Amino acid sequence: WVWEQYDHIIGGNTFQRPGGDAAVVRVLDGPKGLALTTDVTPRYCEADPFEGGKQAVAEAWRNLTAVGAKPLALTDNLNFGNPEKPEIMGQFVGCVRGIAAACQALDFPVVSGNVSLYNETQGRAILPTPTIGGVGLLDDFSISVTLAFKAEGEAILLIGGAPGWLGQSLYLRDVCGREEGAPPPVDLAAERRHGDFVRGLIAAGQATAVHDLSDGGLLVALAEMAMASGIGAELEALSGHLPHAFWFGEDQGRYLVTVAAAQAVAVLEKAAKGAIPAQRLGRTAGNALILPPERPILIATLVRRFEGWLPSYMSGGAA
């Protein structure tokens, strides 16, 4: 709803509009494209500034990768409270160190930025918010992919592991009413391996849809892919996992990828050879999310709930 209030197709060069992992714009009249994204998770930064700083950079890197772009550089917008308070300065230092560690590990340099301090209301500071704006390059913008499912009958693959980290997750906060625990750790070496693998699938034309996993975890990402397309998903029954942790854990360095059913085995074998954790979750099908043994959730219901609440809230209706 927010980005729809503004002109986001100036000059007619917008190839992928906002609303996905990254927007893509064409560079002049040639084949190249630029992908752009902004990311930060303030609750992670408050719980562990160093890991939160790493995660902000890593998520921007993932979002660019998810559309097929090679991440080039970033700008940081560091928003904090009063640095004269030791705890706020500690947040600032920790986040900056985390950002630096991620930039070095991912070859993703900071080329500009700004700092906004003393952000308080009645002496209460904002959450530490080191926003990362990332840009990536596509040699051919036409090969970029989106998060929307493309056709029924395709295999849905999870790239990256599934430990089920619930600390500081939306599930823990919004369902359990608890804001506690450490945020998910960011393994920068794994982040790079997994992202390079996914980018290779896109370049080879094997990936038909890609979405990185972040807020809300696996099931939220699946719902977003389904809502973007109107195509549902039949998911396989879990074995050996706690359902709430598997579906809502916010572990880092992960992607959902769809491929043609005939290519699924080859992609999984390729992942295994590269020591990339990967598994099949199910297939695209129908008009609902089917998660045994739970009742199906119609995509139309998800779209109505997801797209309707903010316009209603902004117009004075019920939240």
What label would you give each PLM region?
Residues W1-G164, L170-G177:
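Glycine-rich phosphate/pyrophosphate-binding loop regions near the starts of catalytic domains
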Residues P31, C95-A102, L106, V111, ...:
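Glycine-/charge-enriched secondary-structure boundary and capping motifs
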